[in-house]
Amino acid sequence: MSRDTKIVATRGPASSDAAVLERMIRAGVDVVRLNFSHGKPEDHVARAQLVREVATRVGRPVGILADLQGPKIRVGKFADGKVWLENGQHFVLDAKCELGNAERAGLDYKDLTRDVSAGSVLLLDDGRIVLDVERVIGSEIYTVVRHGGELSDNKGINRQGGGLSAPALTAKDMDDIRTAVRIEADFVAVSFPKSAADMYMAKQLIHAAGGHAHTIAKIERVEAVEALEEIIDASDGIMVARGDLAVEVGDAAVPALQKRMIRLARERNKLAITATQMMESMILSPTPTRAEVSDVANAVLDGTDAVMLSAETAAGRYPVETVEAMTRICMEAEKSAEVSLDSEFLNQVFTRIDQTISLAAIWTAHHLKVKAIAALTESGATALWMSRLNCGVPVYALTPQPEAVTKMALYRAVFPLFMTQRPATRDELLHDAEQLLTNEGIVVKGDLIVLSAGDPMGTSGGTNTLKIVRVGDQKPWSA
């Protein structure tokens, strides 16, 4: 049984070895995330090269996601590496402080003093520490500790309710986009976007560097939630980044927001990745908790394209076992996923021919109970349209474009297959598609398949033809 939901795994010290990475890919990793918060450009080049070498050896298409660091809204370093804050004590955040202590800490983000005032609530280390702002004087923010605990170097800072003015794309991010293009990353994730303008800028920078990576907006700010539809429209996909998002909007609000984000992304023909602490306990444990199993399964049932692992595979003790567990959970959850066609989605007025053909293929496959859908595609757009509805029939995306193969590795219920050469005629296409699907063990003689293609062929966005084929009939396309 194939798995529809894709798995994104973060590369880190625990998964830097080629043998471990190979086992992870064999276990089910579809996209490898490179965290650009760590490492130099040459490090990312080497990591991307290793991913591609291992994926080629395994024989699976594996995409690469470059995750930009974004603005560093964090405390600075401490003289002893960490301090303990007591409830009720006074604590100062000082933009001019070099090394912190138990009474004050420095700031990486020097403009924080402009964004807060008396009455503001600051959440440190993913909300584990809560500070109430009393007053702001010059470079110093005077606070009282509401909820204390251990605070160590470089922990993140959020303002309850949002409102931090740091730009989404820093100078480092702009340099990193050029590196992402250099390594031919399939996806670039933008951290902390506040508006559609942030995503349009990221796209412009990618194109200016000569790249074609899909942009993924990480929804982790209150402002991003408020501008959600515009941000989705300006992006190729979104990441439900539940860590910082939960800190800003409150953890109880996240489950409903997750469902809304995934639904809106699918309605707009965009990708959705669900991330953060999905299998967190497996950093130290060989098995997930029951709550984590339910969390992953619910994301699958919500319709997410992919579920993502962060520290679990980057720094955990059991990176391979974590991927294996996530694969099992996804496959089991998919057995319960409702196979139905959204009538509201199908009854909308279509504005594109390729969209119309794509959804007609899904409708036909669902009602005719065919074995497979074969979509000849240049860019992957046709396959993406098809993946927005769950008809219970797998979509095999046939493409002569290597970069389209690895991009489609993230599309739910889409299985990309590389065609070594572009068919010159529709009869060649029919023959090559049948042969490829047969050689892969997907269909046998007598099976029905739905085939979509463009006429003329080789044009991105040109899908305009649908044909129902019985494998082995050997009839010409026009028959």
Model-inferred region functions:
Residues M1-A479:
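Non-catalytic helical/linker scaffolds that mediate oligomerization, partner binding
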